[in-house]
Amino acid sequence: AGFAGDDAPRAVFPSIVGRPRHQGVMVGMGQKDAYVGDEAQSKRGILTLKYPIEHGIVSNWDDMEKIWHHTFYNELRVAPEEHPVLLTEAPLNPKANREKMTQIMFETFNVPAMYVAIQAVLSLYASGRTTGIVLDSGDGVSHTVPIYEGYALPHAILRLDLAGRGLTDYLMKILTERGYMFTTSAEREIVRDVKEKLAYVALDFEQELETAKSSSSVEKSYELPDGQVITIGAERFRCPEVLFQPSFIGMEAAGIHETTYNSIMKSDVDIRKDLYGNIVLSGGSTMFPGIADRMSKEITALAPSSMKIKVVAPPERKYSVWIGGSILASLSTFQQ
């Protein structure tokens, strides 16, 4: 969250709401009935954490309202009734959801005006394009969204219910095979950090496995909060490989490369060339080193042999949805 015209968000925090597991023993300890974002994260030991956004779509409106309240009053410190608001939504977000979001903004927060934009379209704007296909992969869901002249093509949008959370779960599982047990919601956050700091995508998975078996070049160490040091090897690239091979976690779904290809094939034949040449990665789960090269390699193998393929991975892509929103909302044409 932040202000239109800024080049980076003012506030970045996880969309989590935590509630105390046990009622406060001592009265007047100032224990709140709910904690949001980083505060929920840091007090996770005594809380039950809930994610009001599932697979990119809001499923718990009371908690979502708490998150918005926290955003306006604690993070941005603005009076929402004084500012028009741009919100974003997942592609193919149900109409009822958009209406509910609008209702809360106008009735609870009294905003003067609002607009809801599709996340992937904003990412494309942020990359300086109006035509291309965006692979947006965040925490709960990945989408491939073909966009032509600024408009998403709904019939060709594909959704994959696999993203950051699934990768963290898988890393927890394969670290268990090494004898490192991570089970609680507090420990899952540690594993998420391991993933973000050490995981990478192999250009050739099988070959990388051989390398990992025969040498220690892949191994890295990580210090846990309690000072214990763990060593992680092949897990580093086995974790994000799930994006390309969802069968690793028992999902009968096409990987991100194949989903992107299928999305292009669902688009009008006349614009496919423009899509192949403008494949834009967006979202935190596209931040793995090596992902763009691998994506390029896989799409090249699927596409017609003469096709020019370009995969773009902007360095700021973790926040490119927000940046695109900042650009859009600061246009004078948009404000009217």
UniProtKB/Swiss-Prot annotation:
Q: Origin, by domain of life? A: Eukaryota
A Pfam family annotated for this chain is Actin
Q: Does the keyword Membrane apply?
A: no
Q: What broad class describes the main subcellular location of this protein?
A: cytoplasm
- Name its cellular compartments: Cytoplasm, Cytoskeleton
Q: Which molecular function terms from Gene Ontology are attached? A: ATP binding; hydrolase activity
Give its E.C. classification number: 3.6.4.-
Cite a GO CC annotation.
actin cytoskeleton
Q: Which reaction does it catalyse?
A: ATP + H2O = ADP + phosphate + H(+)
Q: Which InterPro entries does the entry mention?
A: Actin, Actin/actin-like_CS, Actin_CS, ATPase_NBD
Entry keywords, A to Z: ATP-binding, Cytoplasm, Cytoskeleton, Hydrolase, Nucleotide-binding
Establish whether keyword Nucleotide-binding is in the entry: yes
What else is noted? There are at least 7 different actin genes in tobacco.
Q: Which family does it belong to?
A: Belongs to the actin family.
Reported function: Actins are highly conserved proteins that are involved in various types of cell motility and are ubiquitously expressed in all eukaryotic cells. Essential component of cell cytoskeleton; plays an important role in cytoplasmic streaming, cell shape determination, cell division, organelle movement and extension growth.
Please identify the protein, giving its name as recorded: Actin-104
What species was this sequence derived from? Nicotiana tabacum (Common tobacco)
List the lineage, top down: Eukaryota, Viridiplantae, Streptophyta, Embryophyta, Tracheophyta
